[in-house]
């Protein structure tokens, strides 16, 4: 394999390589190899880092929308078994497009990642809020937010304060609490004195 350089988002080396299935480019993400395939008329040896990254993002079903500035982590558009969603360090938000043939439902919060200008600071903030991000850890700069899980079919949704791998259950009425109360629950859950809010 030939090294083309480091992937800007995950800082892993990107390789150009020939495998059983033919020429490819690949890198590691979360301890898994992710691949991209050059177009038929491309010479593998001519592929530089930018093109390799483009091929990997195109073919691995992930697309970087923007890199969040506090954490340095990418906000990704992914395809999962339930369709398209936006993902950021374990927090996710499903794409929800308005219906084409009938009026929008005022109770539904539509979310279309293709209609957004990711150069715009307000858009980035809107995306982070949609992902339920509240702030950033004072030491690791990892995002802190609320993750909602459904433990089983019969159960209600359960809310967790999440930062990195750590998830601590929190009251279901978390969003109805005063901001000060929310913040003290977060500090207590993560054993921190303060954190940067978004």
Predicted ranges, named:
Residues 1-198:
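Basic, low-complexity terminal or inter-domain segments flanking catalytic cores
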